[in-house]
Amino acid sequence: MSEKTIALLGQPNSGKSTLFNGLTGSRQHVGNWPGKTVERKDGSFVHKGTTYKIIDLPGTYSLSANSDEEVVTRNYIASGQADVVCILADASQLNRSLFMLADYAGIRVPVVLLLNMMDVAKSQGKQIDTDGIAKSLGVPVVPLVAADKKEYGEFFRMLESVDKTASVLKENQLAQVYHSSIGTAFDEIKSLLPADGIGIYSSTWLTAKLMEQDKSACSLVKENVDASTYAAVE
């Protein structure tokens, strides 16, 4: 029997834990992340001969390393242990929920966007163009009602083809946003970094984090460029 690992990411109250519980039932374990007081939840389920291990990562609003929850989430994503990262967004508050995606653009891991609470969005009279969102972001988009297991059909169909369909979020729009809001300083710093980025992090994402003075990103860059380049970055 083959095995795959899914990481669940999302803002607090995105329905992430509801989906986790719906998929795993009693097949779950709760503990702490090593060296942290942050709760770790993992579980598993079987679908069409494949065992899926699910990691319910802490609810966060970004991947900046400003809290233990954010550090845990970012380190796990960077570890490459997940075969696919499922990001949950609240379909009833789509603009607000999609804002967090900017922080995942530029991190080169396979991503699927799960639009949860589609029933609420529908009751509000909202029509969501999932195909249009998928085309814009460059990743699969799956409508979902995490509180209703009968609505998991499209999620399971996504799993069956995830090896072929999951892809990295497009970062070109992220770069444009930073360039328009920050100006030439963004481009100047980006030009000092390795063109291919560092590890799973693109140069665009690293530049954004450097400008936020993200301590972990600063340390990573310092370890991977020469002293004169890092001095110029500072």
Identify the function of each model-found stretch.
Residues G43-K48, V72-P140:
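Conserved C-terminal guanine-recognition region of P-loop GTPase G domains, centered on the G4
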Residues L19-F20, V38, D56, T73, ...:
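Residue-level signature of catalytic and energy-coupling elements of molecular machines
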Residues P34, K53, A65, E69, ...:
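Helical mechanochemical/support elements of P-loop NTPase systems and associated helical scaffolds
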Residues G35, G59-T60, A91-N95, M117-K122, ...:
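Conserved nucleotide-binding/hydrolysis micro-motifs of P-loop NTPases
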Residues M1-L63, G80:
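Conserved G1/Walker A P-loop phosphate-binding module
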Residues A121-L174:
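Canonical P-loop GTPase G-domain recognition
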Residues G138-P140, T165-E234:
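Extended helical scaffolds that flank P-loop GTPase cores
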